[in-house]
Amino acid sequence: MAKHLFTSESVSEGHPDKIADQISDAVLDAILEQDPKARVACETYVKTGMVLVGGEVTTNAWVDIEEITRRTIREIGYVHSDMGFDANSCAVLSAIGKQSPDINQGVDRENPLEQGAGDQGLMFGYATNETSVLMPAPITYAHRLVERQAEVRKNGALPWLRPDAKSQVTFQYDDGKIVGIDAVVLSTQHSEDINQKDLHEAVMEEIIKPVLPAEWITAHTKYFINPTGRFVIGGPMGDCGLTGRKIIVDTYGGMARHGGGAFSGKDPSKVDRSAAYAARYVAKNIVAAGLADRCEIQVSYAIGVAEPTSIMVEAFGTEKIPADQLTLLVREFFDLRPYGLIKMLDLLHPIYRETAAYGHFGREHFPWEKTDKAALLRDAAGLK
């Protein structure tokens, strides 16, 4: 492969779409805490002064949608009308119904192993050995930049920062290996009382330099810090936000394919979410086992049917064993039926709010990031 550039972006927890994702997942967590078998599809819309929470929920649990919404917004940091959005005064509207019985009859079964997929669809999982967390470097460092922005905002190091921010990192590759960082973009909302010179200096010293590895920075690395020159109006006052609009940010930053389904607000019976997590788990274990340097998994389902309609393994020529053997190992060691993958990854717990900002993958404490099958795969493949 010749020299090339690759770019990924991320957004902070205060970005309007991420506010919506976090509210949807906070509602999901609150329901799962009381009723692990609940069916939840929660969608959120945010705009200046208002939040609309809707969707389909079938559960015996009762949760306070308004309180969950306000608490989530408060934790993100929108606590004053000067920011254009205030957790304490915004209107919160709820429009939640029940899951269609037509869908429900195809999902719930007497034998849990026969639990059908909650919808048709295709999902992808990916892993690469170019970082220690087996994720692509561009999305990994894009996430870390906006995560650092939130950290120095919340700990008071840069008190003039506001919750909305975006990052973008362009990496240089030569023959598939990282050789440097070509460009960094960091746009952050700020208060009126900070001048651009001080902002640029503080962002460089407190956010960018502590995050990006020095060995990848060169004299030619370009920096674009608040390139419009001003970012006071942000959050839901600047743009409306919707659940599920940041699916590339949520996954691999464009370096792997995407089946199109969003994650946030969906309980694990929705394979859009749970099977994408399982596909990441499979791909990561294959790479961790040393069976490939890069691996992409595709899995697909039919609504109401337990067995996947297809499983595909792509290693981009980096596989250490024949490709068809990789597929056989996946089928042998991973149960990708809806009930099987929920059990395999222990997904019926309130763990989802935390996934809704800074990426669903590459964060080691999530169960789909375990590499507990790597040794088994390596032994079965006959590698020393």
UniProtKB/Swiss-Prot annotation:
<comment type="similarity">
    <text>Belongs to the AdoMet synthase family.</text>
</comment>
<feature type="binding site" description="in other chain">
    <location>
        <begin position="230"/>
        <end position="231"/>
    </location>
    <ligand>
        <name>ATP</name>
    </ligand>
</feature>
<feature type="binding site" description="in other chain">
    <location>
        <begin position="164"/>
        <end position="166"/>
    </location>
    <ligand>
        <name>ATP</name>
    </ligand>
</feature>
<comment type="function">
    <text>Catalyzes the formation of S-adenosylmethionine (AdoMet) from methionine and ATP. The overall synthetic reaction is composed of two sequential steps, AdoMet formation and the subsequent tripolyphosphate hydrolysis which occurs prior to release of AdoMet from the enzyme.</text>
</comment>
<feature type="binding site">
    <location>
        <position position="17"/>
    </location>
    <ligand>
        <name>Mg(2+)</name>
    </ligand>
</feature>
<keyword id="KW-0554">One-carbon metabolism</keyword>
<dbReference type="GO" id="GO:0006556">
    <property type="term" value="P:S-adenosylmethionine biosynthetic process"/>
</dbReference>
<feature type="binding site">
    <location>
        <position position="239"/>
    </location>
    <ligand>
        <name>L-methionine</name>
    </ligand>
</feature>
<dbReference type="GO" id="GO:0006730">
    <property type="term" value="P:one-carbon metabolic process"/>
</dbReference>
<keyword id="KW-0460">Magnesium</keyword>
<feature type="binding site" description="in other chain">
    <location>
        <position position="99"/>
    </location>
    <ligand>
        <name>L-methionine</name>
    </ligand>
</feature>
<dbReference type="InterPro" id="IPR022630">
    <property type="entry name" value="S-AdoMet_synt_C"/>
</dbReference>
<dbReference type="InterPro" id="IPR022628">
    <property type="entry name" value="S-AdoMet_synt_N"/>
</dbReference>
<keyword id="KW-0963">Cytoplasm</keyword>
<dbReference type="GO" id="GO:0005524">
    <property type="term" value="F:ATP binding"/>
</dbReference>
<dbReference type="GO" id="GO:0000287">
    <property type="term" value="F:magnesium ion binding"/>
</dbReference>
<keyword id="KW-0479">Metal-binding</keyword>
<keyword id="KW-0808">Transferase</keyword>
<feature type="binding site" description="in other chain">
    <location>
        <position position="270"/>
    </location>
    <ligand>
        <name>L-methionine</name>
    </ligand>
</feature>
<dbReference type="Pfam" id="PF02773">
    <property type="entry name" value="S-AdoMet_synt_C"/>
</dbReference>
<dbReference type="InterPro" id="IPR022629">
    <property type="entry name" value="S-AdoMet_synt_central"/>
</dbReference>
<dbReference type="Pfam" id="PF02772">
    <property type="entry name" value="S-AdoMet_synt_M"/>
</dbReference>
<protein>
    <recommendedName>
        <fullName>S-adenosylmethionine synthase</fullName>
        <ecNumber>2.5.1.6</ecNumber>
    </recommendedName>
</protein>
<keyword id="KW-0547">Nucleotide-binding</keyword>
<dbReference type="GO" id="GO:0005829">
    <property type="term" value="C:cytosol"/>
</dbReference>
<comment type="pathway">
    <text>Amino-acid biosynthesis; S-adenosyl-L-methionine biosynthesis; S-adenosyl-L-methionine from L-methionine: step 1/1.</text>
</comment>
<feature type="region of interest" description="Flexible loop">
    <location>
        <begin position="99"/>
        <end position="109"/>
    </location>
</feature>
<feature type="binding site">
    <location>
        <position position="43"/>
    </location>
    <ligand>
        <name>K(+)</name>
    </ligand>
</feature>
<dbReference type="InterPro" id="IPR002133">
    <property type="entry name" value="S-AdoMet_synthetase"/>
</dbReference>
<dbReference type="GO" id="GO:0004478">
    <property type="term" value="F:methionine adenosyltransferase activity"/>
</dbReference>
<dbReference type="InterPro" id="IPR022636">
    <property type="entry name" value="S-AdoMet_synthetase_sfam"/>
</dbReference>
<feature type="binding site" description="in other chain">
    <location>
        <position position="56"/>
    </location>
    <ligand>
        <name>L-methionine</name>
    </ligand>
</feature>
<dbReference type="InterPro" id="IPR022631">
    <property type="entry name" value="ADOMET_SYNTHASE_CS"/>
</dbReference>
<keyword id="KW-0630">Potassium</keyword>
<keyword id="KW-0067">ATP-binding</keyword>
<feature type="binding site" description="in other chain">
    <location>
        <begin position="245"/>
        <end position="246"/>
    </location>
    <ligand>
        <name>ATP</name>
    </ligand>
</feature>
<feature type="binding site">
    <location>
        <position position="239"/>
    </location>
    <ligand>
        <name>ATP</name>
    </ligand>
</feature>
<comment type="subunit">
    <text>Homotetramer; dimer of dimers.</text>
</comment>
<dbReference type="Pfam" id="PF00438">
    <property type="entry name" value="S-AdoMet_synt_N"/>
</dbReference>
<feature type="binding site">
    <location>
        <position position="266"/>
    </location>
    <ligand>
        <name>ATP</name>
    </ligand>
</feature>
<feature type="binding site" description="in other chain">
    <location>
        <position position="15"/>
    </location>
    <ligand>
        <name>ATP</name>
    </ligand>
</feature>
<feature type="binding site">
    <location>
        <position position="262"/>
    </location>
    <ligand>
        <name>ATP</name>
    </ligand>
</feature>
